[in-house]
Amino acid sequence: MATPSFGVRSTAGQVKDLLAPDAILVSVSKGIEKGTSLRMTQIIREVTEDKWPVVALSGPSHAEEVARQVPTAVVSACPDQTAAEVVQDLFINDHFRVYSSSDVIGVELGAALKNVMALCTGCCTGMGLGDNTKAMLMTRGLAETARLGTALGARKDTFAGLAGMGDLIVTCTSMNSRNYRAGILIGQGTPVQEAIRKIGAVVEGYYAVDSARELAAQVGVEMPITLAAYDVLYRDRDPREVLLSLMRREKRHEIEETWF
């Protein structure tokens, strides 16, 4: 299934009666559902009554480059390792390398939250800030993603892999990224909704930041960068003021128990 996150539920409902008994469902959608805080594979499993294994296929893989057969690596993740390895075998080839994982929670959270961080780094580019600021937001953004993930049962080392750090790097630095480009426009002063319209495609980070904020509140996890992004995107706060508030947070030790 390769739909925007808000279309996964309806799409799963449309196809569930067409599936063979031995089917394996593969989701390449990235996000967290608004209102339910469910990941994409959770939605599919719920709608299909958990009758089929659902695999998340994710990683640093801009479609434009995959189509050109640029060497790429991703992760096939499912608690059912047999299903993950079947998908691995189906997709792996000389230009598309696939690793398997049982940590679907970590893989899907990394996929969803990297879009939020890409909006942030794009905003920094739009404001004319340097590489230092973007590196700070990417690194600390990954830290809070790992913090949320481990609270929900993910393995912390997943966030150092392709679906975590890998996807974060490619999405936060490339003009192929819709979220990064939208962030640039916002940083240049374009109103949020106008920036999204100008991109002309779904900006998943806009939806993910609200869902991630709700999910973090549910499990009591601190996510300051995600909340800062929410303030800019939903409360029309000035990005420079929000960044300054992040810089003025209480000092702390860098390495956490949930970090690498």
What is each of the regions a protein language model found here?
Residues V8, E33, S37, T41, ...:
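Generic structural signal for well-ordered, non-membrane alpha-helical segments
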Residues A2-T3, G31, C78, T173, ...:
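Conserved residues at beta->alpha junctions
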Residues G7, L18, I43-P53, P71-T158:
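Internal alpha-helical scaffold of NAD(P)-dependent oxidoreductase catalytic cores
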Residues T121-T125, T150-A160, G164-F260:
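NAD(P)-dependent Rossmann-like dehydrogenase/reductase catalytic/cofactor-binding core
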Residues M1-P71, V87:
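Rossmann-like NAD(P)(H) cofactor-binding subdomain of soluble oxidoreductases
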Residues S27, P53-S58, V98-S102, M223-I225:
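General beta-strand structural signal in soluble alpha/beta enzymes
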Residues K30, A56, A135, T139, ...:
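Alpha-helical transmembrane segments of multi-pass membrane proteins, especially transporters
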